Amino acid sequence: CIRNLYHLFTNKKWIIKFNSKVEDVKFTNRKDLFNLFNKGPVTPDHVIRIKSEPLIIPNKHLSSSKKLSNYIDAYIKKYKNYFKKYKKNIINSKIADPLPRIIILEGIGFLSIGLNKKEMQVSFDIFDAMKKVIIKANLVSKFKSINNTDIFKMEYWPLERAKLNNKNSKKFNGNVAVITGGAGKIGSAIANKFINENIEVILLDKNFKNLDINIKEKCLCIACDLTNNSQ
């Protein structure tokens, strides 16, 4: 649902990972969840890569696609207003895409988001470190970040933006391919071709013992028997 909403907002395809390990769910049940993670970034990488704060959606609204769309739309509008207010601090700054890279789903986990698997993983790694710092800081005091003017200057620092804007975006960014018989020579050759085009690949086969390790590390491998209806 959220991947489709992102596509509707941007006309691009996105890679989204649902993080629901015990520690990922635990922090989303905090009573101070909505106040703890809206205070700004911990380091420059946080604001540059995943915005200064995540989008947090209350549990009671998670089952409504309309509500989800409204929350994302509100986040976008808030970000655009932030850019409009502070753009005077960086001459000739151009707005980055305003979509959240982290969405916290109260009570069930969080989503890490990117235009490809690598970007999605960067979103996860940065937020995972960020939340640990904020939670630990609050054990001894209260976490406080820099003000919005300085956040904007950091986020739109021209040299950093130039580096991000010059990233090559391949035609098939954000697409996902599922290959049956993926551990065989033909399946792995197809997978390798897709990987080179920035397509995220899921391989299905009975086992992956003989699969090239370089292919295996770049794909999601699911062991299954497609002839077995019980699977």
Where do the language-model regions lie?
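Conserved glycine-rich cofactor-binding loop
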Residues: A183-G184
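Aromatic pocket-lining residues of Rossmann-like dinucleotide-binding sites
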Residues: F194
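N-terminal Rossmann-fold NAD(P) dinucleotide-binding loop
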Residues: G187-S188
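Conserved glycine-rich Rossmann-like NAD(P)H-binding loop of the short-chain dehydrogenase/reductase
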Residues: I199-D212
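The beta1-alpha1 cofactor-binding region of Rossmann-like NAD(H)/NADP(H)-dependent oxidoreductases
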Residues: C224-Q231
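Domain-length cofactor-binding catalytic modules of enzymes
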Residues: C1-K171
